[in-house]
């Protein structure tokens, strides 16, 4: 039986367990896992901050090699997905396509029946998370074949933050030459910088910490960086100096810190746009001034939740095309086996790693990517 790192409950050490292999139904497939990311969401899961059906197998964004498929399994182009293909997949599954959010609002990330690999499936349901030697692709899971020229490590280096950032940058409706501030220098923020740069941003300011992450943001395309060690008022003054006294056209909050939302409202120019994609769990409230920061400034503010299939599809193509220009691969600073999954969580929580990944089959990674 394949092994998996199982999260049995809040703040409990993960356990490596045998998980039965599935009997593949028609339209199902089995992946042999190459990489599965360790996301900030996994830390929140471990802290018990999301309502999930423990025990679970974490790992919601993963890359694997197709080991078996039953019947015809195809991607959206109609091309068969076959043994040996390297794929990723949309972690959100079982959206109903029959509710208000799916059909009227056309916002499937809000479907109340959706299930998510690595989050809302129990380990008792089977190999439905990426921190395992194998992952069960249930019928209907939307897979994306990675182009042959794309190193899987490049894609997983972006990971969940890659598709979240693409969604957020899309929501800015960025015009060529507009100024952007990205608040947060973690995985989501780094990819926000990369995609804003590729979208033609003019002045592109990364705000965050520590300094090595800000230097990395410059490699992703930031034209200026501001450290959190600088007081908020001085950061505001610096942004205004860089933007003719106005503030930036768009701000993307990608930090998860409530205070960053308040700062975003200060940094944006009158009539600008603010996208909030970092507040995935409840980190507490923040006080704002509705008149001065919202109404009088005539700004737009939008929340950005998760990602859709189109973001995964485009992210695979974009990392294949621009992966040598944007150092997503180098974001993977630490790789861990299943036995060291607890250390992986600590590395992400302590921010000693920009991106940590689980490699359940290290020998397969070496043979595939050597």
Model-assigned labels for residue ranges:
Residues 20-21, 53-59, 122-127, 134, ...:
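Short Gly/Pro-enriched turn/cap motifs at secondary-structure boundaries
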Residues 22-36, 49-100, 147-148:
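Glycine-rich beta-strand-centered segment in the early N-terminal region that forms part
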Residues 39, 90-144:
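Cysteine-cluster motifs in flexible loop/terminal segments that predominantly coordinate metals
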Residues 133, 145-231:
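Mid-domain Rossmann-like dinucleotide-binding core that forms the NAD(H)/NADP(H) cofactor-binding site
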Residues 171-176, 188, 198-199, 211, ...:
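Glycine-rich cofactor phosphate-binding loops and adjacent beta1-alpha1 units
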Residues 224-230, 333-340:
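Short acidic-hydrophobic, aromatic-tinged amphipathic segments that line or gate anion-handling sites
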Residues 236-241, 245, 282-332, 343, ...:
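C-terminal substrate-binding/catalytic core of Rossmann-like NAD(P)-dependent dehydrogenases/reductases
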């Amino acid at each position: 039986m394949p092994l998996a790192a199982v999260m049995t409950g809040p703040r409990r050490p993960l356990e490596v367990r045998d998980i039965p292999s599935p009997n593949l139904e028609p339209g199902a497939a089995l992946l042999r896992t190459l990489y599965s990311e360790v996301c900030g969401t996994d830390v929140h899961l471990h802290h018990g901050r999301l309502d999930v059906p423990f025990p679970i197998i974490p790992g919601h964004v993963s890359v694997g090699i197709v080991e078996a498929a039953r019947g015809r399994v195809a991607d959206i182009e109609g091309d068969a997905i076959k043994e040996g293909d390297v794929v990723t997949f949309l972690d959100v599954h079982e959206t109903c396509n029959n509710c208000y959010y799916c059909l009227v609002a056309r916002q499937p990330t809000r479907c109340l029946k959706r299930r998510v690999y690595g989050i809302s499936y129990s380990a008792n349901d089977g190999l439905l998370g990426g921190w395992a030697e194998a992952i069960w692709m249930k019928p209907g899971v939307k897979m994306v074949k990675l182009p042959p020229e794309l190193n899987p490590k490049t894609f997983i280096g972006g990971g969940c933050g890659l598709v979240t950032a693409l969604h957020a940058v899309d929501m800015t409706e960025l015009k060529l030459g507009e100024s952007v501030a990205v608040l947060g220098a973690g995985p989501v923020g780094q990819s926000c910088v990369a995609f804003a740069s590729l979208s033609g941003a003019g002045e592109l300011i990364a705000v965050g910490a520590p300094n090595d992450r800000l230097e990395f943001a410059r490699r992703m395309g930031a034209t200026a960086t501001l450290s959190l060690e600088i007081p908020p008022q001085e950061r505001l003054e610096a942004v205004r100096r860089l933007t003719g006294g106005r503030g930036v056209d768009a701000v993307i909050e990608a930090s998860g810190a409530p205070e960053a939302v308040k700062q975003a409202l200060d940094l944006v120019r009158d009539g600008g746009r603010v996208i909030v994609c970092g507040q995935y769990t409840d980190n507490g409230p923040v006080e704002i001034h509705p008149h001065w920061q919202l109404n009088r400034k005539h700004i737009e503010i939008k929340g950005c939740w998760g990602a859709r299939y189109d973001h995964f599809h485009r992210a695979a193509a974009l990392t294949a095309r621009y992966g040598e220009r944007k150092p997503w691969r180098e974001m993977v600073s630490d790789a861990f086996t299943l036995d060291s999954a607890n250390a992986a969580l600590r590395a992400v929580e302590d921010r000693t790693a920009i991106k940590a990944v689980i490699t359940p089959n290290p020998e397969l990674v070496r043979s595939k990517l050597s």
